[in-house]
From Swiss-Prot:
Stored HAMAP family: NDP_kinase
Protein name listed in UniProt: Nucleoside diphosphate kinase
This protein's record includes keyword Zinc-finger: no
Origin species: Nocardioides sp. (strain ATCC BAA-499 / JS614)
Record keywords: ATP-binding, Cytoplasm, Kinase, Magnesium, Metal-binding, Nucleotide metabolism, Nucleotide-binding, Phosphoprotein, Transferase
Localization terms from the record: Cytoplasm
Length: 135
């Protein structure tokens, strides 16, 4: 079933010049870019996006990281896009991600793990509403 999902190419991906390499992996799996924008976000957007983590100990450094430089937000569409993106991204901790995944091949640390992908169709809908209202 064709679904939409939100992907963030985090500031480390932009800083390291990996945007094209990462996008090509999604496109090679048949996912279509529906919307894409590079921007720098403020703490309010980060807090809205990561609402379930705001009170957790690890969150302040994560917020500083995602607000510390430009990122690329995009909506991808395709068959089972949520699951496909999560498989392509690999394990959240890049040191544990399998080779052949985006994080396994390019990630340098757990926090600077290059990408975010929605974890469910419901999360995708909520996150797309934050990043691309009206889409």
């Amino acid at each position: 079933m064709s679904l939409r999902t939100l992907v963030l190419l985090k500031p480390d991906a932009v800083r390291r010049g990996l945007v094209g390499a990462i996008l090509s992996r999604y496109e090679a799996k048949g996912l279509t870019i529906v919307a894409m924008e590079q921007r720098t976000i403020d703490a309010a957007v980060a807090d809205q996006h990561y609402a379930e983590h705001v009170a957790k100990e690890f969150y302040p450094p994560l917020r500083d990281f995602v607000t510390g430089g430009p990122l690329v937000a995009l909506v991808l569409e395709g068959d089972n896009s949520v699951d496909v993106v999560r498989l392509l991204n690999g394990a959240t901790d890049g040191s544990k991600a399998a080779p052949g995944t985006i994080r396994g091949d390019f990630s340098l640390s757990n926090r600077e793990n290059l990408v975010h992908g929605s974890d469910s169709p419901e999360s995708a809908e909520r996150e797309i509403g934050i990043w691309f209202p009206g889409l």
